[in-house]
Amino acid sequence: MTTTRRLSLAYLALTAGVAVLFALNLFWGSVSLTPGAVAAALLGRGEDVLAVGIVLQLRLPRAVMVVLLGAALSAAGYLLQTFFANPIAGPFVMGVSSGAKLAVALTMVVFLQQGLLTGSATLIIAAFAGSMAAMAFVLVVARRVPRMSILVICGIMIGYICSAVTDIVVTFAQDSNIVNLHNWSMGSFSGMTWANVGAAACVVLPALAAAFLLSKPMAAYQMGESYAKSVGVPVRAFSTALVLLSSLLAACVTAFAGPISFVGIAVPHLVKNLLGSAKPLYVLPGCCLGGAAFCLLCDLIARSLFAPTELSISSVTAVFGAPVVIWLLVRRQTQEGRE
């Protein structure tokens, strides 16, 4: 099979997967709806007020948000893997998501205890500040630690520290307005509104576009810093852009849905295997589609498996994502043993 044909079929499969899973997310849930009822609601012809409300105000904005944030999380993972040259680097593993989680939790508690509301912009700014703080610590450690495995362990430890402090904050937050804080801290797409969708789109879409524009220098950077410099890539500025974009994308996800594990690690590798190519120009769009499809599937399971009880999204992503990480580690160790 030629490369072009394989890429075309892979993109077609990913796009079809997103479309099918998006539709299923509108049909299934604690209240199942027929395709006709969903279509009528989308076309403005629905006569069942309850069905129209469920589709247009609950499931549709949630599904759109899952697509946006799934794409953002997968792309963030790919950018971090490129920056650290490590296949298991990701927002959750490197502590970036946990830093954002802590900052958002503190912001929500402080604002709500003062009787103030937290808008989307406030949450995104807080999450970005937290993610950058965690990333800064990881970068400081990276200068002192030559082995990437130790750096990953440090990132995991940062995540544990931030998660522990967040759990303490959530435990002692005695305010009736922050009932959903615990669910958010576990990872959840519930409660998404069209205002949330608009705010997330204003951050995610430009960031993804900027990442795509960096595809060519990214390919050179993956060959090594020396090679990148030899072909004219401003390595320092490029590295800074990778850090900022990955942190911003991960922060936006955490601000709205809480920390979501393993998506940023697993999806880029699954996409590269599906595409049969490691070129960023091909992998980045594939990551966006793959991340959207993966999160749509996991959210559908989280909502429907034990309906009306909803599982945390991280619980489901971990079930599917963790085996991929184990497979990566085993394959890498096997390859090193052969060499």
List each language-model region with its residue ranges.
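Alpha-helical transmembrane segments in inner-membrane proteins
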Residues: 1-339
